[in-house]
Amino acid sequence: MKEEETTYHVPVLLKESVDAMNISPDGTYVDVTFGGGGHSREILSRLGDGGRLLGFDQDEDAERNIVNDPHFTFVRSNFRYLHNFLRYHDIGEVDAILADLGVSSHHFDDSERGFSFRFDGKLDMRMNKRAGITAADVVNTYEEERLADIFYLYGELKNSRKLASVIVKARTGQKIETIGEFLEIIKPLFGREREKKELAKVFQALRIEVNQEMEALKEMLMAATEALKPGGRLVVITYHSLEDRMVKNIMKTGNVEGKATQDFFGNLQTPFRLVNNKVIVPDEDEITRNPRSRSAKLRIAEKK
């Protein structure tokens, strides 16, 4: 494993996910979450002269991990624009698409990015540092009801309304700009026993809102469904229930809402066949080596 992979992000379920892509040496593949490049390097190692791989990442920091390989093309973009960039690169159908939806270790460990409550720093949380609102913008400008909805929907926090109320009251006196200031406001709401878990949910909710993660995932999954050729594989690693539900729905019904559609004769219409009915999870050895892989779930579907 290359040094940049271990410092930026350790690839999760590496062999299992790339094996699931059913790589053909001359095939065309997409890694929509390039990150540290771990999965992409493994894919490239299995390609021949006619093979091709596109790697997507919206974070400029990921560009330093770009693979020097003639079969690789890096796309600095949010994966929600998958359809646009496949057209731009004159690619019709692809053989497999891989998505590792976990936040890179680099983001959690870089105090300047504001993703973790372990460090003080600016409340930022943007995956793309050049675009969008920050977490500070969310906590300082959103109405109380909207804040409560975000914490409830994206963090699944039971005390979302109380949390929103405390934040709104605190910001009337002074703008909340740093993680330290934010923690001082919200920590009293959580008991010491569950503090870390509850804070993780709060930060997850803000990160999802800042980066519009659910909307982006929906657009990517719909584009992936269209882009895959018959027999092509959709391979996705999820880390929390919200994204996992969306992925499970698209694979089972062909839409993220999970609404089953039937043809005139009552037959279930779905673009995919499930390759693994039971999710694949990291073994104890991988969890020991990389504790952040603990919540990972691998789902695989094949286009009909």
Swiss-Prot record:
Subcellular location: Cytoplasm
UniProt: S-adenosyl-L-methionine binding residues: 37-39, 57, 79, 100, 107
GO cellular component, as recorded: cytoplasm
Enzyme class: transferase
InterPro entries (alphabetical): RsmH, SAM-dep_MeTrfase_MraW_recog, SAM-dependent_MTases_sf
Keyword Cytoplasm part of the UniProt annotation: yes
Keywords from the UniProt entry: Cytoplasm, Methyltransferase, rRNA processing, S-adenosyl-L-methionine, Transferase
An MF annotation (GO) of this entry: rRNA (cytosine-N4-)-methyltransferase activity
GO biological process: rRNA base methylation
Main location: cytoplasm
Reaction(s) this enzyme catalyzes, per UniProt: cytidine(1402) in 16S rRNA + S-adenosyl-L-methionine = N(4)-methylcytidine(1402) in 16S rRNA + S-adenosyl-L-homocysteine + H(+)
EC number annotated for this UniProt entry: 2.1.1.199
Disulfide bonds: none
Function per UniProt: Specifically methylates the N4 position of cytidine in position 1402 (C1402) of 16S rRNA.
Name of the protein this chain belongs to: Ribosomal RNA small subunit methyltransferase H
Lineage of the species this protein comes from: Bacteria, Pseudomonadati, Bacteroidota, Bacteroidia, Bacteroidales
Gene name of the encoded protein: rsmH
